[in-house]
Amino acid sequence: DWSSDVCSSDLVARRESARLVLKKIQEIAGPSSPVILTGDFNVDQTDEVFTILSSSGLQDAFTYAERRLAPNGTFNDFDTELKTESRIDHIFVSQGFRVRRYAILTDSYWTEKPQATIQGSGNAPEELKLKKHIRRAPSDHYPVLAKLSYQGK
């Protein structure tokens, strides 16, 4: 299992990082070992770096998943109201893996607004106390999950 966090600001550095990761995987794991490569690659599925990785013999788990739950892309900038189709966090697998499920987990949490209790509002019964909250993202990236099985080559 390999993980990477690729430089976000320099195109040349991102391209060379992808090539270096692939080279190291070949040197260490060899051509016949099962490989799972995950990471924040800071490029979406339309970028040249993504093409370098997905044309290397590794498969994009999103593309090959039997079932997908991806209501959003993977970057949210800590704002739960942002929506994108871009995935900058990826899971790549070598031949022999079956990608049964793929998901981008968009869970969030709530924090209470100070002094934001409302007593019986609108259609709600009067005794019902409602509290205003702010929805927050726990990270600037949504986690990516894949359920894999290995069947060999």
Regions found by a protein language model. Name each.
Residues 1-8:
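Short, small-residue-biased leader/transition segments that mark boundaries at the very start
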Residues 4, 39-41:
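Short, well-ordered beta-to-alpha junction loops that form the rim of enzyme active sites
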Residues 9-26:
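Active-site beta-loop-alpha substructure in enzyme catalytic cores
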Residues 10, 37-38:
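A generic structural signal for short
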Residues 23-35, 43-153:
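Metal-dependent phosphoester-hydrolase catalytic domains
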